[in-house]
Amino acid sequence: MESERDMYRQFQDWCLRTYGDSGKTKTVTRKKYERIVQLLNGSESSSTDNAKFKFWVKSKGFQLGQPDEVRGGGGGAKQVLYVPVKTTDGVGVDEKLSLRRVAVVEDFFDIIYSMHVETGPNGEQIRKHAGQKRTYKAISESYAFLPREAVTRFLMSCSECQKRMHLNPDGTDHKDNGKPPTLVTSMIDYNMPITMAYMKHMKLQLLNSQQDEDESSIESDEFDMSDSTRMSAVNSDLSSNLEERMQSPQNLHGQQDDDSAAESFNGNETLGHSSIASGGTHSREMGDSNSDGKTGLEQDEQPLNLSDSPLSAQLTSEYRIDDHNSNGKNKYKNLLISDLKMEREARENGSKSPAHSYSSYDSGKNESVDRGAEDLSLNRGDEDEDDHEDHDDSEKVNETDGVEAERLKAFNMFVRLFVDENLDRMVPISKQPKEKIQAIIDSCRRQFPEYQERARKRIRTYLKSCRRMKRSGFEMSRPIPSHLTSAVAESILASACESESRNAAKRMRLERQQDESAPADKQCKPEATQATYSTSAVPGSQDVLYINGNGTYSYHSYRGLGGGLLNLNDASSSGPTDLSMKRQLATSSGSSSSSNSRPQLSPTEINAVRQLVAGYRESAAFLLRSADELENLILQQN
């Protein structure tokens, strides 16, 4: 029959063009089939170029048929090639392996035709064609490496099936030659399940494209739709297309069909030749969203957007403007595209917390757009630092230049020093004393306000690296790597430590003066008194401005530990300037002993003194460590 010969020629040309040896698809051509057979028989010579091919054949598990399955062909005996495929019985979840015959690309037409057209008891053909699901199910039960896309393409080129699907927009049958219109076949997405809802959608899309062509030929520059109607139509099309793209595929078939259908879709050239008015861009969009060869359950049960016009489909799928449209349409498309971009940027920016929330609260008037961009980049760096635990010092100090890089190095050394002196490096951060962790974070926030959001993550990363180095057997007191330190960073670190020491001394003097000037009648309630002055005495005198090139940072120190307890971080970083406090403590205790016959300190004061003593000892260790590192730096420089 003439129509069948034309159908065979067109389908065969498409198969060779799409699944041929030149295409990067996971299908088996005649040449590849014979090569696999030779490799399994051991007749193919070993070379370096076929090592990858041998590995692929071995991984797939190709097998030759049994001797009784060897059948004679036109040119002699032809061996049958099988491949194991995982299958399920449809009831349980147990998978089993079953052999499927390898389908050759050159035989796709004969295989699909034999499964699609039913035959009678005597071998005669019955004019009864199976549907897409039944055809593909029968093929998948017997063959492998035959993608669903080829089955759908075959059914869409079958004249009998097209008559049954009523694709003709006029409602009449096709011509006697049975050739489908090129416009219809170009609009079909061959990875979509051929359901009645899909066919109705394609029919309406074809009608809309013809109406758009007629209107554009008569009045190309006229825009007769009202503003609200046009925008609502575009928005409805946008939402419908987004819903189609968000539908999750349903896994119905084996892995070899998924790979072949996903990788063979790039060879379908008929989709690229469809005109803009016929909605080719929309069909290409749906093809991309379903290119894995799987069908969505929602697509079988719910009809698609039947009011979807090719013009709006092109707009929503590609987010670009057609230059051939009228000025009025371009105006509303520009508005829609700008709204979409603003919403997308708002969602992206809203998912990230601002990096400097504390400092930007006091210096919000000095913030700029450049500062916001830098904050987001810093925040992304923190997320990477949390994700990758295998880096010892994961701060990207080389990505920034000048003062920022040096301050980042100083910040890293600042955290390392305070962790070494105050925390047990073999204990995770979740099991460390929360007061000590908070004290280190507060100190980092005072001295390096631009990196305040990194403090906790930096502590956690350093503790992880210490535990990892301990397991590896390295020395824990290793020097800081050369790429993480410099002379400028050391000077910044020294300035930060000195500033922290002065601040600690100032806070302790203010607390001691407040304690001495407290009324005698409130001594019976030491807890309440210390809680009040620890939060009221310091803010008025602790206004420190930090200028770092991106804005002015203003920090107001608020004691968060309460109870009159000495800040452990302040005590650990307090240097020799705090020796005057010891003398003040002695004189105050002497005056109290002279006034009272029996000198006695409260438990809170005793605890504060003990912590002060521990702080001085830790400060001495800190100074000794700093001196050793500075000496090592001098030796490295010389």
From Swiss-Prot:
Here the segments flagged for biased composition (Low complexity) are 588-597
Q: Where is this region: Disordered?
A: 210-312, 343-403, 503-535, 573-603
The main location is: nucleus
Locate the compositionally biased regions of type Acidic residues: 211-225
What are its GO cellular component terms?
A: nucleolus
Q: Which UniProt keywords apply?
A: Nucleus
InterPro entries membership: HTH_NOL4, NOL4/NOL4L
Tell me the GO molecular function terms. Answer: RNA binding
Q: In which tissues is it expressed?
A: Expressed predominantly in fetal brain, adult brain and testis.
- Where found, per UniProt? Nucleus, Nucleolus
Keyword Secreted set for record = no
- Which Pfam families did the record assign? HTH_NOL4_2nd (PF23079)
Nucleus as a keyword?
yes
Q: Where is the composition biased (Polar residues)?
A: 229-254, 263-281, 302-312, 351-363
Basic and acidic residues: which segments have biased composition?
Answer: 364-374, 391-403, 503-515
Q: What is this protein called?
A: Nucleolar protein 4
UniProt source species: Homo sapiens (Human)
